């Protein structure tokens, strides 16, 4: 019904094979008695599977990881809202906790109304297809200073985008943590180009 909400989830969390399957449906007028729903009127299917072998002949390598993650979302009448496939092509975890990874994605979206992403930069309604890939590395969180850097490049609505994100973790004193994040985006659209910069700092005590 218009007020209903339903869903189901299956998980298979194991060391070699890790799988997940979930389905969720929210009616157009669903109104939770506690909390809030960020979006109504959709059906969403999300399957994920990962293969994570542990090479016995690579002394410095703890585990490899390969996987694919899908998301298929429609409105209540079955019209496509979003369809995304993320391929985690390769991830390597070393014995010291450091990691390196590479992946790619294909995204299909339907925009039902025009959207002004920035002043005088309007994305018109319609169907959009985008492709992109990312590469990154991170150090172990057990270090007093840990870091992560990732770069993404791909399609973005009517144009292209390049993104660089860095994270820094400082853990010099027990019970006190400092987290910093920096993200830079260089966006080029048919309606114009723009750049964004985001800073985030979190202190945990």
What residue ranges belong to the model's regions?
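Exposed, low-structure sequence patches enriched in small/polar residues
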Residues: 1-205
């Amino acid at each position: 019904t218009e007020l209903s909400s339903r869903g189901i989830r299956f998980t298979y969390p194991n060391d070699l094979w890790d799988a997940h399957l979930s389905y969720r449906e929210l009616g157009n007028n669903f109104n939770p008695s506690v909390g809030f729903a960020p979006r109504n009127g959709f059906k969403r299917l999300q399957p994920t599977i990962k293969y994570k072998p542990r090479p016995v002949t690579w002394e410095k390598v703890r585990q490899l990881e390969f996987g694919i993650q899908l998301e298929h979302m429609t409105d209540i009448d079955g019209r496509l809202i979003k369809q995304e496939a993320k391929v985690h092509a390769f991830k390597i975890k070393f014995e010291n906790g450091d990691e390196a990874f590479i992946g790619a994605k294909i995204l299909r979206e339907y925009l039902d109304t025009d959207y002004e992403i920035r002043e005088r930069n309007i994305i018109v309604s319609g169907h959009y297809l985008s492709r992109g890939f990312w590469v990154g590395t991170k150090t172990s969180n057990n270090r007093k200073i840990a870091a992560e850097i990732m770069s993404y490049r791909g399609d973005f609505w009517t144009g292209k985008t390049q993104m660089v994100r860095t994270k820094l973790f400082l853990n010099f004193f027990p019970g006190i943590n400092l987290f910093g994040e920096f993200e830079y985006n260089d966006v080029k659209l048919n309606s114009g180009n723009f750049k964004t910069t985001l800073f985030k700092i979190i202190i945990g005590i």
